A protein has these predicted regions:
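Acyl-CoA-dependent O-acyltransferases
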Residues: 1-222
């Protein structure tokens, strides 16, 4: 979405806007504010398509390593995740302005709940129960006809630009293949603290998404 030169500044501006309206002194993370920005834009896309606000359900990947009370071998590999979940409930007042901090709060609360719940996992049975409960909730939401479903994944803070298989470190690392639609993948920019967001949408949705004022402002097109 952004070149590395402008990404950090844009995210800093987003965090400032969100922080101004968040209760308390906490500062949202860059992943939280970028997720919230995209979620807000997607909500506006859905309203443009359907003529009204629609409820939506967000799934965000969450790495369980170092977050659970049972030991995990340092040399373990593969996916060890249980996603954080968040909901947007459409307000009866269709004219009410939907603000960025509204989505930041929901993303933050979903992630904090996953952190809290994961800290209680101390056995294989606890882990199995937690994963099954989350997957069941996801499946139920996915089959709701009146709600939109969005899946987010973040590889931020993974040292992918330090990997060297013998022919040098990568000039650019990306997740080129994103199967399906309503899928969003975050990666660090190479040279700074920015984020690349890979967005996969239906073509009609993508056209509306690209014209969203918040997205255009964030990417320097507004």
């Amino acid at each position: 979405m952004l070149d590395s030169q402008n990404s950090t500044l844009a995210i800093s501006n987003l965090k400032a806007v969100a922080s101004a309206n968040i209760h308390g002194s906490r500062q949202p993370t860059r992943v939280e504010v970028v997720t919230a920005l995209l979620w807000k834009a997607l909500t506006m896309v859905a309203r443009a398509k359907h003529g009204r606000l629609r409820p939506s359900f967000l799934v965000h990947s969450f790495n369980l390593r170092g977050k659970i009370a049972m030991p995990v071998p340092d040399n373990s590999f593969g996916n060890f995740t249980n996603p954080a979940l968040a909901r947007f409930t459409a307000d009866e007042d269709e004219n009410k302005k939907v603000e960025l901090d509204h989505f930041v709060d929901r993303v933050h609360d979903g992630i904090r709940k996953r952190v809290t719940d994961s800290a209680k996992i101390s056995s294989d049975d606890d882990l199995f129960s937690s994963v099954v409960s989350t997957k069941t909730e996801m499946i139920e939401e996915f089959h709701r006809s009146d709600a939109d479903f969005y899946m987010f994944n973040s590889w931020c803070r993974m040292p992918v630009y330090e990997v060297d298989f013998g022919w040098g470190k990568p000039g650019w690392f990306s997740a080129v293949v994103v199967p399906g639609h309503n899928i969003f993948h975050f990666m660090d920019t190479k040279d700074d603290d920015g984020i690349e967001a890979w967005v996969s949408l239906e073509e009609d949705d993508m056209l509306l998404f690209q014209e969203n004022p918040d997205i255009k402002a964030f990417t320097g097109q507004g």
